[in-house]
Amino acid sequence: MSFNTFGHMFRVTTFGESHGVAIGCVVDGCPPLIPLTEADIQGDLDRRRPGQSRFTTQRQEADQVKILSGVMAHPETGVQVTTGTPIALLIENTDQRSKDYSEIQNKFRPGHADFTYEAKYGIRDYRGGGRSSARETATRVAAGAVARKVIAGMTVRGALVQIGPHQIDRDKWDWAEIGNNPFFCPDKDKAAFFADYLDGIRKSGSSIGAVIEVVAEGVPAGLGAPIYAKLDTDLAAALMSINAVKGVEIGDGFATAALTGEENADEMRMGNAGPQFLSNHAGGILGGISTGQPVVARFAVKPTSSILSPRKTIDRAGHDTDILTKGRHDPCVGIRAVPVGEAMVACVLADHLLRHRGQVG
C-alpha cells in the first residue's frame, strides 16, 4: 500500500492499523530548535481520545504518545528541542477486541472500505477496519501538534456546527464553550439539544453525520501558489483524506452558487494597519493564496457505517447474505473529527509556510 505520506516540505507519513500493536507517524521537514515535548502532543491527543463520553466509542485507549527520535536537550538551555531530523511518534494500541469481528471476516460491511480494499489488494484487515479505521487519525493529531509548533503565531480551532439536519445558531457562537461540552460545540443551547438528540440516535443503535468548521487565524497573506499548489487545493485534499469525510468547502463554499457578484466579492478599504476586507466570503483565500484574513474550511462527515441493524451485503465467495455489525463504534464520528480537522489544517499551513519561506525568503 503506497500513498501514506502527505505534504511537501512538512511531510507526514502515518503507519499502523486499528488492531495492530501500535500506530504512529514520522514527521519530516520540521525545522530545528523548536521546543517539543510529549506533553505538547498529548494535549491534542487527549481531545480526540475515545471513550470520554457516552457519545463516542467506548473503546478505551490511553493514546499515550512516545517521541522516538528527532529531539534532544539543547546543550545550553537543557530545553528539549527539535533537531531537524525526522520525528518519529508512536502510540500503542491497548484495547483491541478482534473477536468482535470474527463473524464478519468473510463479509463486506456496507458503507465501509471492506469491498474496495479487497478489490484492490486481494486482502483486507477485517479487525476493526485495519488501516481504514478512524483509529489512524490519532497519528494525524500527533503530527498536527508538531505542526502547531511550526506555525506559532497562528491559531487553528475547530467546532462542530451541525449534527444531522440540526445546525448551531451562529449568533450564539462562543469559542469558550468548546471545552464545556462533549461535542466541541460553540453554541451552549445547541450543545444541550445535541445531547438529547444523539442519545436517541445512540439508543436506537443507529448513527448520524455532522459538519465541522475549522478556522485558522493569524495566517499571513501570501501562503499558497497558483496554479497547482493552491492553499485551498491542499486544504481540501487534506480534509477529504480524513475517514468518513464526504464533502469539503472553503469560505461560503456551495452557498456562493446562490449569491450575486455584488454579494460574494469581498470588498476592501485601507485601514490604519493596512488593507482591510469588509467581509470574508472567500474564507481567507483568493487565487489559491492566503489573504491575511481567517482561513475558514468546513467538512461533512457521513454517519458511522457500523450500526446495530441488520444490513444486506455479499460475502467474499460472492453470495448474498445479511450482516449485523458488532463492536464499539461512534454514534457520530464527526465529534472526534474536530481535532483531526484542526490537525490537518495545521499540517497544511506548516507545509505552505515552509514552502513560502523557501520561495520568497
Swiss-Prot record:
FMN binds at R131, S132, S133, N243, A244, G287, K302, P303, T304, S305, S306, R328. Keywords: Amino-acid biosynthesis, Aromatic amino acid biosynthesis, FAD, Flavoprotein, FMN, Lyase, NADP. NADP(+) binds at R48, R54. HAMAP family: Chorismate_synth. GO terms for cellular component: cytosol. Homotetramer. This is Chorismate synthase. Its cofactor is FMNH2. It catalyses: 5-O-(1-carboxyvinyl)-3-phosphoshikimate = chorismate + phosphate. Coiled coil: none annotated. Disulfide bonds: none annotated. Belongs to the chorismate synthase family. It comes from the Bacteria. Reduced FMN (FMNH(2)).
